[in-house]
Amino acid sequence: DYATITYTSGTTADPKGVVLTHRNYTANVEQSLSRIDIPSSYRTLIILPLDHCFAHVVGFYIMIACGASVATVQIGATPMETLKNIPQNIREVKPNFLLSVPALAKNFRKNIETSIRAKGPFTERLFDFALRTAYIYNQDGYHKGKGWRILLAPVVGLFDLVLFRKVREAFGGSLEFFVGGGALLDSELQRFFYAIGIPMFQGYGLSEATPVISTNSPKYHWHK
């Protein structure tokens, strides 16, 4: 039976209505869970619009299938007020993972860097050095800590303890990863979030595929 008519984003042509069945959705949930494990204790906060199958499958249905918890952003009197509720809602919900798109990822990074700059030039320089060190250690993700870079592990661990952990606390302190979609996420952004301990696992999908086709995961990932 038909479940929804989902419209494509219109990236390459005019948006088109895609008829998706209940089995389309349940099959994609099963496929997604073969790549990323979701314990029943997990929580997520849906920030993305609720009118697309990305939020349906990865935000709602996989959580329902695993008996996990879902929250949505508190609606404000205006769209801008709703956006302003996101940071507070994240701290309240303490999500284990979040859905993201490139625009949202850029905004998160901008806010993090603004907060670091506000702490003064010493903290800013230290954060930049810690970030560069983590980049060298992590490489492309798949080859993290390989070869001589294993020697950097204690240094990266120290930076994580004194710097990156404090950044993660702004996301509730429980955030383990993002699932990214919607468009190609710049590899530099992927490296940034990986360095601070909140990997953004890039996925690829099509509305016609309900939508997940492939994705990086905690076990298999490569920043490209």
Model-assigned labels for residue ranges:
Residues 3-29:
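Conserved AMP-binding A3 loop
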Residues 4-7, 17-19, 45-46, 71-72, ...:
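Structured core elements
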Residues 23, 103, 183-184:
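Alpha-helix/helix-capping structural signal
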Residues 26-45, 50-153, 157-164, 174:
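Conserved AMP-binding/adenylation subdomain of ANL enzymes
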Residues 71-73, 151-157, 169, 173-180, ...:
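Conserved ATP-binding loop and adjacent catalytic segment of the adenylate-forming AMP-binding
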